[in-house]
Amino acid sequence: MVNDFNEKNGIKKRLLDFFPVVLEGIREILESMQYFPEETEKLLYSIKRNTLGGKNNRGLAVLQSLTSLINRELEEAEFRDAALLGWLIEILQGCFLMADDIMDQSIKRRGLDCWYLVVGVRRAINESQLLEACIPLLIRKYFRNMPYYVDLLDTFREVTFLTELGQQEDLLSSRDGEASLRSFDLMKYDFIITYKTSFYSFYLPIKCALLLSRNSNQKAYDTTIKLSKLLGYYFQVQDDYLDCFGDYTVLGKVGMDIQDNKCTWLVCYAEKFASADQLNLLRAHYGKAGSENIAVIKQLYHELQIPELYHKFEDDMVDSISKEIDLIDESTGLKKCIFTKFFQLIYKRSR
């Protein structure tokens, strides 16, 4: 059996080597519109800067999932189609992150200054929209003659809407003031992470692979949604924990959730278990800028044993996800190994 680490890195190199093809496709679209050459280069640089630099897990997932579904190595045309869709998901991720950094007033992303700090808020907003808008044009350019073309367009549009709906609720729930803290609860949190994270991070790559493999089994799609929600929940709670207790040098970004008044797993449970005095402390310091406020909240989390609760949660989620993977009906064409690989990527991660 091929070593998973070497296999992943070999595929990753091929995926990265393919990215210029995607950029060239965008260039051809812009040239057909007679867009100005100098501005074309600026936009292509923005796309490159805001798409590259991550772990590429979503793009890799399309390639690895398709390989598992057809149970053989990908032919060149199959690799090309899967790599294209993988990069479209990475571009979608890039546009979400650009907007997210503006809304959260973040400083660093993937170890670099956030794009809005480089080019200004107005240009960064418009370029995030351009990243999103180029996706259906690239799908039309490369897949318009395929039988799954409409399904592909529909899937990207739906997932984009669901993700932005989750982002909207995340934004509204983190509005300034004590009232927002009182509105934090696990039901609201579940909604945010289901729509903000699960669909584009887990469901979309696998759905793309299912479409490429010509699998139209509804049960396979339903199972994919169910497991994607579980994986997304686990992934986002990890994100919340790492934002507070992770190592910046490993994460490549500065944690902002406490001062940004975010509805996180940590604050939901802190509210649930806090005494009256602790709740007053939480309301006095949560959502406030300044290292002293952040230190108070982190100390409160320790007093409430939130880190210990997180580690128990992680163990329970590992057990639940493992059991759900074992229940997958492979007669639908879906493969257990697809979700196992996803699970291995995020299992007790540190970034």
From Swiss-Prot:
<dbReference type="InterPro" id="IPR008949">
    <property type="entry name" value="Isoprenoid_synthase_dom_sf"/>
</dbReference>
<keyword id="KW-0460">Magnesium</keyword>
<dbReference type="GO" id="GO:0005634">
    <property type="term" value="C:nucleus"/>
</dbReference>
<comment type="pathway">
    <text>Isoprenoid biosynthesis; geranyl diphosphate biosynthesis; geranyl diphosphate from dimethylallyl diphosphate and isopentenyl diphosphate: step 1/1.</text>
</comment>
<keyword id="KW-0125">Carotenoid biosynthesis</keyword>
<feature type="binding site">
    <location>
        <position position="58"/>
    </location>
    <ligand>
        <name>isopentenyl diphosphate</name>
    </ligand>
</feature>
<dbReference type="GO" id="GO:0005783">
    <property type="term" value="C:endoplasmic reticulum"/>
</dbReference>
<feature type="binding site">
    <location>
        <position position="253"/>
    </location>
    <ligand>
        <name>dimethylallyl diphosphate</name>
    </ligand>
</feature>
<keyword id="KW-0963">Cytoplasm</keyword>
<dbReference type="GO" id="GO:0046872">
    <property type="term" value="F:metal ion binding"/>
</dbReference>
<dbReference type="GO" id="GO:0015031">
    <property type="term" value="P:protein transport"/>
</dbReference>
<dbReference type="InterPro" id="IPR033749">
    <property type="entry name" value="Polyprenyl_synt_CS"/>
</dbReference>
<keyword id="KW-0653">Protein transport</keyword>
<comment type="similarity">
    <text>Belongs to the FPP/GGPP synthase family.</text>
</comment>
<dbReference type="GO" id="GO:0045337">
    <property type="term" value="P:farnesyl diphosphate biosynthetic process"/>
</dbReference>
<keyword id="KW-0414">Isoprene biosynthesis</keyword>
<dbReference type="GO" id="GO:0004311">
    <property type="term" value="F:geranylgeranyl diphosphate synthase activity"/>
</dbReference>
<dbReference type="GO" id="GO:0005737">
    <property type="term" value="C:cytoplasm"/>
</dbReference>
<feature type="binding site">
    <location>
        <position position="100"/>
    </location>
    <ligand>
        <name>Mg(2+) 1</name>
    </ligand>
</feature>
<dbReference type="GO" id="GO:0033386">
    <property type="term" value="P:geranylgeranyl diphosphate biosynthetic process"/>
</dbReference>
<comment type="pathway">
    <text>Isoprenoid biosynthesis; farnesyl diphosphate biosynthesis; farnesyl diphosphate from geranyl diphosphate and isopentenyl diphosphate: step 1/1.</text>
</comment>
<feature type="binding site">
    <location>
        <position position="197"/>
    </location>
    <ligand>
        <name>dimethylallyl diphosphate</name>
    </ligand>
</feature>
<feature type="binding site">
    <location>
        <position position="109"/>
    </location>
    <ligand>
        <name>dimethylallyl diphosphate</name>
    </ligand>
</feature>
<feature type="binding site">
    <location>
        <position position="104"/>
    </location>
    <ligand>
        <name>Mg(2+) 2</name>
    </ligand>
</feature>
<dbReference type="GO" id="GO:0004161">
    <property type="term" value="F:dimethylallyltranstransferase activity"/>
</dbReference>
<dbReference type="GO" id="GO:0004337">
    <property type="term" value="F:(2E,6E)-farnesyl diphosphate synthase activity"/>
</dbReference>
<keyword id="KW-0808">Transferase</keyword>
<feature type="binding site">
    <location>
        <position position="55"/>
    </location>
    <ligand>
        <name>isopentenyl diphosphate</name>
    </ligand>
</feature>
<feature type="binding site">
    <location>
        <position position="262"/>
    </location>
    <ligand>
        <name>dimethylallyl diphosphate</name>
    </ligand>
</feature>
<comment type="function">
    <text>Catalyzes the trans-addition of the 3 molecules of IPP onto DMAPP to form geranylgeranyl pyrophosphate. Required for the membrane attachment of ypt7 and rhb1. May be involved in vesicle trafficking and protein sorting. Required for forespore membrane formation.</text>
</comment>
<feature type="binding site">
    <location>
        <position position="196"/>
    </location>
    <ligand>
        <name>dimethylallyl diphosphate</name>
    </ligand>
</feature>
<feature type="binding site">
    <location>
        <position position="110"/>
    </location>
    <ligand>
        <name>isopentenyl diphosphate</name>
    </ligand>
</feature>
<dbReference type="GO" id="GO:0005829">
    <property type="term" value="C:cytosol"/>
</dbReference>
<feature type="binding site">
    <location>
        <position position="104"/>
    </location>
    <ligand>
        <name>Mg(2+) 1</name>
    </ligand>
</feature>
<dbReference type="InterPro" id="IPR039702">
    <property type="entry name" value="FPS1-like"/>
</dbReference>
<feature type="binding site">
    <location>
        <position position="100"/>
    </location>
    <ligand>
        <name>Mg(2+) 2</name>
    </ligand>
</feature>
<dbReference type="InterPro" id="IPR000092">
    <property type="entry name" value="Polyprenyl_synt"/>
</dbReference>
<dbReference type="GO" id="GO:0033384">
    <property type="term" value="P:geranyl diphosphate biosynthetic process"/>
</dbReference>
<keyword id="KW-0813">Transport</keyword>
<comment type="subunit">
    <text>Interacts with fps1.</text>
</comment>
<keyword id="KW-0539">Nucleus</keyword>
<protein>
    <recommendedName>
        <fullName>Geranylgeranyl pyrophosphate synthase</fullName>
        <ecNumber>2.5.1.-</ecNumber>
        <ecNumber>2.5.1.1</ecNumber>
        <ecNumber>2.5.1.29</ecNumber>
        <ecNumber>2.5.1.10</ecNumber>
    </recommendedName>
</protein>
